[in-house]
From Swiss-Prot:
Gene Ontology CC terms, in alphabetical order: cytoplasm; ribonucleoprotein complex; ribosome
PROSITE patterns documented for this protein: RIBOSOMAL_L21 (PS01169)
Keywords linked to the UniProt accession: Ribonucleoprotein, Ribosomal protein, RNA-binding, rRNA-binding
Keyword Cytoplasm among record annotations: no
Organism: Clostridioides difficile (strain 630) (Peptoclostridium difficile)
GO MF terms, alphabetically ordered: rRNA binding; structural constituent of ribosome
Subunit annotation: Part of the 50S ribosomal subunit. Contacts protein L20.
This protein's name: Large ribosomal subunit protein bL21
Pfam families listed in its UniProt record: Ribosomal_L21p (PF00829)
Functional description taken from the UniProt entry: This protein binds to 23S rRNA in the presence of protein L20.
GO BP: translation
Source organism, top-level taxon: Bacteria
Similarity comment text for this entry: Belongs to the bacterial ribosomal protein bL21 family.
Cited PANTHER family: 50S RIBOSOMAL PROTEIN L21, LARGE RIBOSOMAL SUBUNIT PROTEIN BL21M
Length: 103
């Protein structure tokens, strides 16, 4: 059984027990979050497609940790003009474990 869920503007194919790194969710470590935007779900070989979401379907996941990804360096310059800008960015993420798919 699997489901396609949308969170943080991205889509993920999940099964029970999967570990995901998603865009930051407002929850603490140990909390259970419910992802209601289920775009499709498959159970016993039968695929349900939503338009845009599957009615009554949800995915429950447990928050393992909140964190930040590795730093990405953004460097802008203009040749021969002595113009240089260096900036770093660390994206926040939430690590979750899928516990249950309700279809």
């Amino acid at each position: 059984m699997y489901a396609i869920v949308k969170t943080g503007g991205k889509q993920y194919k999940v099964s029970e027990g999967d570990v995901l790194f998603v865009e930051k969710l407002e929850a603490n470590a140990g909390d259970v979050v419910t992802l209601n935007e289920v775009l499709a779900c498959s159970k016993d070989g039968e695929l349900k497609l939503g338009s845009p979401v599957v009615e009554g379907a949800s995915v429950q996941a447990k928050v393992v940790e909140q964190g930040k990804a590795k730093k990405v360096i953004v460097f802008k310059y203009k040749a021969k003009k002595d113009y240089r800008r260096k900036q770093g960015h660390r994206q926040s993420y939430t690590k979750i474990v899928v516990e249950k798919i309700n279809a």
